[in-house]
Amino acid sequence: MDERIISSETVDAEEVSFETSLRPQNLSQYIGQDKVKNNLTVFIEAATLRNEALDHVLLYGPPGLGKTTLAMVIASEMGSQIKTTSGPAIERPGDLATILTSLEPGDVLFIDEIHRLSRAIEEILYPAMEDYCLDIVIGTGPTARSVRLDLPPFTLIGATTRAGLLSAPLRDRFGVIDHLEFYTEEQLTEIVLRTSNILDTKIDDLGAREIARRSRGTPRIANRLLKRVRDFAQVRGNGTVTEKLAKEALTLLQVDPRGLDTIDQKLLHTIIQSFRGGPVGLDTIAASIGEERETIEDMQEPYLLQIGFLQRTPRGRIVTETAYNHLGISYEKEV
């Protein structure tokens, strides 16, 4: 499958480096997620006043909304070092033990995709999170013995796109659980303007708003679209991103005014044309459009549900009248 310009996942190492260069250093520079920021400000200040490690934090929500960035900002606000890893990277208990024993007092351990930790790894985390200790088994067979090692106070920040896959015992050990929401058009416009300033790209307010409007409520997509529109401005314009140029560029990139691309439209058209608008099961949809179920659940559904183009029911997915109107298809409600 071709790379999607509106994918909310990072696509390569270059984009990871690009995102790193744009990251804010503190909560005051972090745009959006105001409720989360306000609460974290209080929790961080309280922990600092008590000279304690911040409670463990779980951040969940669709990809591209700034979970990793927020983890970095939390560490910066705490004046702490941060060590980063991911669920798939921790394959054996020894991998986690090595990371935990390398922590210094007050450090932040960030685990992305924490829902992908195995149960064996989770069980090692329980005492580490609750009591700052690590139980390890030395030897094998009848001579094996358990040794408890003390760990320094630390903060675990877990990030996940699928909080429902976390086991209850692990989820319950997080003192702070925050859901990151899609961004508003105004917030994304502010992000586009900030990024354009960092990139030394000329852009007017209407140009920034046009990019924001098509960014699916996701900063990562907004920044990626800005980079591509900037190319059009330099090659086919005078170097300035205007509303007119942004519209032309994004149309050529096949991103419509609501942020849908050809894959989104294919999904909606398939449900409408092949299944009379639904309800239809997700596995059937996936087979019909040649996508994996998990890809649809993580990458397409959240935004289509958010803007009211899709409904999730016990019987399956249904395309809404709003989506019909957007696609220019006559909507006939079944009696």
UniProtKB/Swiss-Prot annotation:
Q: What is its main location?
A: cytoplasm
Catalytic reaction equation(s) = ATP + H2O = ADP + phosphate + H(+)
User: Which parts of the sequence bind Mg(2+)?
Assistant: 68
What does the protein in this record do? The RuvA-RuvB-RuvC complex processes Holliday junction (HJ) DNA during genetic recombination and DNA repair, while the RuvA-RuvB complex plays an important role in the rescue of blocked DNA replication forks via replication fork reversal (RFR). RuvA specifically binds to HJ cruciform DNA, conferring on it an open structure. The RuvB hexamer acts as an ATP-dependent pump, pulling dsDNA into and through the RuvAB complex. RuvB forms 2 homohexamers on either side of HJ DNA bound by 1 or 2 RuvA tetramers; 4 subunits per hexamer contact DNA at a time.
Q: Which organism is it from?
A: Listeria monocytogenes serovar 1/2a (strain ATCC BAA-679 / EGD-e)
Signal peptide range in chain numbering: none
Where is it located? Cytoplasm
Region entry Small ATPAse domain (RuvB-S): which residue ranges? 184-254
Could you say which enzyme class this protein belongs to? hydrolase
Q: Which GO terms describe its cellular component?
A: cytoplasm; Holliday junction resolvase complex
The record's comment on protein family reads: Belongs to the RuvB family.
Q: What is the protein name given in its UniProt record?
A: Holliday junction branch migration complex subunit RuvB
Highest taxon of the lineage: Bacteria
Q: Which gene encodes it?
A: ruvB
E.C. designation(s): 3.6.4.-
Kindly list the positions annotated as binding DNA. Answer: 293, 312, 317
Which SMART domains does this one have? Answer: AAA
Question: What subunit structure does UniProt give?
Answer: Homohexamer. Forms an RuvA(8)-RuvB(12)-Holliday junction (HJ) complex. HJ DNA is sandwiched between 2 RuvA tetramers; dsDNA enters through RuvA and exits via RuvB. An RuvB hexamer assembles on each DNA strand where it exits the tetramer. Each RuvB hexamer is contacted by two RuvA subunits (via domain III) on 2 adjacent RuvB subunits; this complex drives branch migration. In the full resolvosome a probable DNA-RuvA(4)-RuvB(12)-RuvC(2) complex forms which resolves the HJ.
What does the record say about domains?
Answer: Has 3 domains, the large (RuvB-L) and small ATPase (RuvB-S) domains and the C-terminal head (RuvB-H) domain. The head domain binds DNA, while the ATPase domains jointly bind ATP, ADP or are empty depending on the state of the subunit in the translocation cycle. During a single DNA translocation step the structure of each domain remains the same, but their relative positions change.
- A single GO molecular function, which one? four-way junction helicase activity
**InterPro entries (UniProt xref):** AAA+_ATPase (IPR003593), AAA_lid_4 (IPR041445), DNA_helicase_Holl-junc_RuvB (IPR004605), P-loop_NTPase (IPR027417), RuvB-like_N (IPR008824), RuvB_C (IPR008823), WH-like_DNA-bd_sf (IPR036388), WH_DNA-bd_sf (IPR036390)
Region of interest: Head domain (RuvB-H): 257-335
* Binding annotation for ATP: 22-23, 64, 67-69, 130-132, 173, 183, 220
Record-linked Pfam families: AAA_lid_4 (PF17864), RuvB_C (PF05491), RuvB_N (PF05496)
